[in-house]
A protein has these predicted regions:
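LRR flanking "cap" motifs
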Residues: 1-36
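Intrinsically disordered regions, especially transient/low-confidence alpha-helical propensity segments
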Residues: 10-12, 40, 160
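A residue-identity detector for tryptophan
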Residues: 13-15, 43, 163
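Structural signature of tandem-repeat unit edges
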Residues: 21-35, 49-65, 75-91, 101-117, ...
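Non-membrane alpha-helical segments in proteins
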Residues: 38-45
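Register-specific detector for alpha-helical tandem repeat solenoids, activating on a conserved position
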Residues: 41, 68-69, 94-95, 120-121, ...
Length: 223
């Protein structure tokens, strides 16, 4: 057992567990529901052999503002129910599912992202995912989408309809090496208000033949 508040306001298990690579299952006790963490930064970072999380419904995230690196390098984590996450106060989701290569499906349909500003590398190298419906995400405050889907090499479709991209300043390598994408609908993207860096945005998207955009899509620097 570990205390919930350790270094940098994160639980003791983040910094004081030398055996993270041996952990295959995490179980949240019902008593954990009484805790009100303010950050989930790096909670399971480096748990490379973690396959399942039980009792995640007892994790109350209503006060959490930071989820970056939360599951970074949880390469063997399989389908997990995130539907109970309260993300209304979260501002940073960068690298949240970075290198979660065994996730074959990801339901974050209940995520409220109205305060999120950083989605950098959020799904980086999620090679198990073949489709993502993210049309519900509120991206009105997001300024960074760098590397968001980079190396999602098996992603066949991604629904980004309804996204508000007026505040995004970087889409660098956003879809780089999404080698299986054939079409991409960015018709809702508005990049006129910011000078948006787009370097390598579609690098090595070898199968991508069609990109739908509107007259609101101003080609940024580095494309």
């Amino acid at each position: 057992e570990y205390g919930i508040y350790g270094g940098l306001g994160t639980p003791d298990w983040v910094w004081q567990n030398p055996n993270v690579t041996n952990v295959t299952k995490v179980v949240f006790d019902p008593a954990f529901a009484n805790a009100r963490p303010t950050t989930c930064y790096a909670w399971f970072q480096g748990y490379v052999n973690l396959t399942s999380i039980e009792g995640i419904e007892y994790l109350n995230t209503s006060q959490v503002t930071d989820m970056h690196n939360m599951f970074l390098n949880c390469y063997h984590l399989q389908t997990t129910d995130f539907s109970g996450f309260d993300t209304r106060k979260v501002k940073d989701m960068s690298y949240m599912f970075y290198n979660c290569g065994s996730l074959e499906s990801l339901d974050i349909s209940n995520f409220n992202t109205s305060e999120v500003t950083n989605m950098r590398g959020m799904f980086y190298h999620c090679i198990g995912l073949t489709s993502l419906d993210l049309s519900h995400l509120n991206t009105s405050k997001v300024s960074i989408m760098t590397e968001m889907f980079q190396l999602c090499i098996n992603l066949l479709s991604v629904n980004l309809s309804g996204w508000d991209t007026r505040n995004v300043g970087s889409m660098t390598k956003m879809f780089e090496k999404c080698k299986s994408l054939k079409t991409l609908d960015l018709s809702g993207f508005d990049t006129r208000e910011k000078t948006c860096s787009m370097g390598g945005m579609f690098n090595t998207c070898n199968e991508l033949t069609t990109i739908f955009v509107s007259d609101k899509f101003a080609v940024g620097t580095g494309v």
